[in-house]
Amino acid sequence: MIIVIIFLVIYFNNQLYMCVSSTCVIQWCAIQCKRKEANGIGTCKPRPNQGKIQYRKLKEECHCVYKCS
């Protein structure tokens, strides 16, 4: 029983932190920039003090820890 629980925790953790492809991250990031900037043009760069870009798969969308600048 414990083994099953551990397996499920590992499985769901991987689902949350794995991104299907970098393309969906770029697309999501571009959408965020368009929402934040009136002209719809923006470049996405990693946030400062973010050692590594974090990808999360949530509700079939990929999100990234990025800011628009």
Swiss-Prot record:
Disulfide bonds join 19-68, 24-44, 29-62, 33-64. It is found in: Secreted. Keywords: Antimicrobial, Disulfide bond, Fungicide, Plant defense, Secreted, Signal. GO terms for cellular component: extracellular region. GO terms for biological process: defense response to fungus; killing of cells of another organism. The keyword Disulfide bond applies. Coiled coil: none annotated. Residues 1-15 form the signal peptide. Belongs to the DEFL family. This is Defensin-like protein 166.
